[in-house]
Amino acid sequence: MPQDPRHPEHQYLDLVKHILENGARRMDRTGTGTLSVFGATMRFSLEDNTFPLLTTRRVFYRGVVEELLFFLRGETDSKVLEKKGVRIWEKNGAKQFLQSVGIDREEGDLGPIYGFQWRHFGARYETSASSYEGKGVDQIASAIAAIRANPASRRIVVSAWNPTDLGSMALPPCHVLFQFNVTDGKLSCAMYQRSGDMGLGVPFNIASYSLLTILVAHLTGLQPGEFVHFLGDAHVYLDHVDSLRQQVQRPPRAFPKLFVSPKGPRTEPEHFQYEDFELVGYDPHPAIKMNMSA
């Protein structure tokens, strides 16, 4: 499919405009209310070190990297991120929030969320401090092995949606599953997101799965190809409407470049550190305040 001849960020801006103009008004789990549409697709090239970190509002790059590495290590304690200044899971890990969804665990214990499912699918979850080494299905390792051994496979799929564990999660997965594809020496990734918060979540998710693709391409000796983003319920929270109306008026700027420059041996995805990635040329418009609905 050919790329939009305009700046690729217009895909995001146009979808936001479409939701603002045509979205169905709905109440939601958080009580905030949304404007919502069902079914959308965006495509972002990752070639030539391009990194689709949106420019019409500053995206929390450090948070993108640290959260992805947190998932790849199979970690589930939000305090690990908070110690690094990344507080995106703080509200969902709060004791009061956990109790409100019927979970009785220590503060910060998010349960069997993304990283646990990626690295230990099917294992019995105990606590965020428990060891799960050798337990469950390591979907990430299996995907990397498949890319190397059988790159033409159509089964290189990783799922975070485990119905038996949903009730134990602080928040069920919004980005549910992803699939890798190898074509002409290039690695691409398609991700399906059942629920997409267009203001805060989706810009973060675009960057996160693009980074995942770049990291796995590095490990498997491939070039990054494309990130394809499928959205189910794409929505704008009602308290984000004014902020997003402001954002869609801004012209996109050139996407930055991202280089993988490991500072030590990195043979497995969980070995990577924040310092192994170099972001060059990120020049976004100023931040726009938006509140998170938990």
UniProtKB/Swiss-Prot annotation:
Pathway participation: Pyrimidine metabolism; dTTP biosynthesis
Matches recorded under InterPro entries: Thymidate_synth/dCMP_Mease, Thymidate_synth/dCMP_Mease_dom, Thymidate_synth/dCMP_Mease_sf, Thymidylate_synthase, Thymidylate_synthase_AS
Keywords of this entry: Methyltransferase, Nucleotide biosynthesis, Transferase
Active site: 174
GO cellular component: cytosol; mitochondrion
Entry's EC annotation: 2.1.1.45
GO biological process, one term: dTTP biosynthetic process
Gene3D superfamilies, alphabetized: Thymidylate synthase/dCMP hydroxymethylase domain (3.30.572.10)
Gene Ontology MF terms in the entry: thymidylate synthase activity
Pfam families: Thymidylat_synt
Keyword presence, Transferase: yes
The organism's place on the tree of life at top rank: Eukaryota
SUPFAM superfamilies per the UniProt record, alphabetical: Thymidylate synthase/dCMP hydroxymethylase
PROSITE patterns: THYMIDYLATE_SYNTHASE
Reactions it catalyzes: dUMP + (6R)-5,10-methylene-5,6,7,8-tetrahydrofolate = 7,8-dihydrofolate + dTMP
Binding site for dUMP: 29, 154-155, 194-197, 205, 235-237
Record: residues binding (6R)-5,10-methylene-5,6,7,8-tetrahydrofolate: 197
NCBIfam families per UniProt: PRK01827.1-3, thym_sym
Family: Belongs to the thymidylate synthase family.
Name of the molecule in the record: Thymidylate synthase 3
Organism annotation: Encephalitozoon cuniculi (strain GB-M1) (Microsporidian parasite)
Gene: TS-3
